[in-house]
């Protein structure tokens, strides 16, 4: 039976398609060559590597794949609307650094489990960058630890889940959280700020979050704090909630601020799954950056952050 190959459709544009050059670039992002024992979870950005690759690498380099048999990859949908978790139909996900084998049996098991999961077409899969941008990073670090070819992946596009669907999916996934042979990659950028994103929230007081949310409309920009500092404050409040509080608290933060964290549902799902599994480890953010420092309302930026557990 022929295998369905998910091609590296964003190679050559979002990241380098040359094996040697991509390897050299990813090596340049590494600070600490030794993974941390037992780290199995990472929140990782999904912009072009020239923008977010360094931040993403700070998380991936901590992952310990020595005992891992399977890596779940959660990513949001940028092109279609769905209320479900859509599982890849591919047999192989291609990268310039080597192929990643998909755990087809588990993908089929997820789809058959309940109404929370369904499968996505190969066209939908290949159009979505949030999953693909994790694949070369994953392949690089698996190869580095001598695990490429030994580990299978489970790519899942996470839709705009209702609370009921979120809980059902989390309960089912909790069994895989408990199993230490599983690792999880959660794909998400943080704040998308600017008129082109329809989001120009300005936070001038981090101590009074609900009262401090303003829509800034002048042509210029505030000076205390500067807009990029406000964006950072806004993101870091959310990051602190991910580190120390519950998935429900994170949901409330998003309702209050409307922060444009594109991977909000993948993040909520992994937090809820950890809670259902009574998993004690918490995410710790280790790197944060912005694509540019916004000072004027006419400017824009995207934030990138990575955390591990």
Swiss-Prot record:
Pfam families reported in the protein's UniProt record: Memo (PF01875)
HAMAP family: MEMO1
Species of provenance: Schizosaccharomyces pombe (strain 972 / ATCC 24843)
Superkingdom as given in the UniProt entry: Eukaryota
Identification of the protein by name: MEMO1 family protein C4H3.04c
PANTHER family registered for this protein in UniProt: PROTEIN MEMO1 (PTHR11060:SF0)
Disulfide topology: none
InterPro entries, alphabetized: MEMO1_fam
Similarity-based family: Belongs to the MEMO1 family.
